[in-house]
Amino acid sequence: MHTTQKDTTYTKIFVGGLPYHTTDSSLRKYFEVFGEIEEAVVITDRQTGKSRGYGFVTMADRSAADRACKDPNPIIDGRKANVNLAYLGAKPRVMQPGFTFGVPQIHPAFIQRPYGIPTHYVYPQAFMQPSVVIPHIQPTATSATASSPYIDYTGAAYAQYASAATAAAAAAYEQYPYAASPAATGYVAAAGYGYAMQQPLATAAPGSAAAAAAAFGQYQPQQLQAERMQ
């Protein structure tokens, strides 16, 4: 004689989240308030004999199982359990209000693009280095040509060079018998243009100006006039 197995799809309940000290009797005691119980079993560990944290309860009818599953706060042996029909599995845990979980924000530049297109990485402002600005140092008049490879073509520098050139020209033309044109000594270059150039060579020795002046002194005016008259 073959016995037909009873359909327990809507009467067998899965109970999860049980403490280690929960037994079959304590599990049955909790579900008795919902109706008649056919079976209550706690799954235990074979070596230790303690509860593995879940069990199964089979109610006599479907209405009793529905009442047990609708309990909003099932507390078994001091711990809230997860009660649901066995064929549905454990209920998904509901987030309790008042708790927020922060998700780290991902910068849009670090999201990988499809089809193998390379991603342009954008670095935060904190990692960007500022542009290097070289401060301009105004050279002094005495050390402009000796310490800096760039000649300062400002008005002050031209005034210095113009005065020195005027003095040297006056010393040279004093020994020449013919008067020089005023335009030659009164010319001063316009200032305002500046550009970088190589380090200028050392100025001519003072002896060269003296040698040129001596050569003009030895050439007599009479000889010049005689040559012009020929």
From Swiss-Prot:
Protein name per UniProt: RNA-binding protein 24
Keywords assigned by UniProt, alphabetized: Cytoplasm, Differentiation, mRNA processing, mRNA splicing, Nucleus, RNA-binding, Translation regulation
GO molecular function: mRNA 3'-UTR AU-rich region binding; mRNA 3'-UTR binding; mRNA CDS binding; pre-mRNA intronic binding; RNA binding; sequence-specific mRNA binding
Keyword Nucleus set for record: yes
Listed GO CC annotations: cytoplasm; cytosol; nucleus
SUPFAM superfamilies documented for this protein: RNA-binding domain, RBD
The record's note on its domains: The RRM domain is necessary for mRNA stability and mRNA translation regulation.
Residue span(s) of domain RRM: 11-88
InterPro entries: Nucleotide-bd_a/b_plait_sf, RBD_domain_sf, RNA-binding_reg, RRM_dom
Gene: rbm24
Pfam families: RRM_1
Signal peptide: none
Outcome of gene disruption: Morpholino knockdown of the protein leads to death at 6 days post-fertilization (dpf) due to heart growth defects and absence of blood circulation, despite the presence of a beating heart. Show reduced heart contractility from 30 hours post-fertilization (hpf), onwards. Display defects in sarcomere organization from 33 hpf, onwards. Show altered expression of key genes necessary for sarcomere formation.
Subcellular location: Nucleus; Cytoplasm
Protein purpose: Multifunctional RNA-binding protein involved in the regulation of pre-mRNA splicing, mRNA stability and mRNA translation important for cell fate decision and differentiation. Plays a major role in pre-mRNA alternative splicing regulation. Mediates preferentially muscle-specific exon inclusion in numerous mRNAs important for striated cardiac and skeletal muscle cell differentiation. Binds to intronic splicing enhancer (ISE) composed of stretches of GU-rich motifs localized in flanking intron of exon that will be included by alternative splicing.
Chief site of localization: nucleus
Organism: Danio rerio (Zebrafish)
Gene Ontology terms describing biological process: 3'-UTR-mediated mRNA destabilization; atrial cardiac muscle tissue development; circulatory system development; DNA damage response; embryonic neurocranium morphogenesis; eye development; hair cell differentiation; heart looping
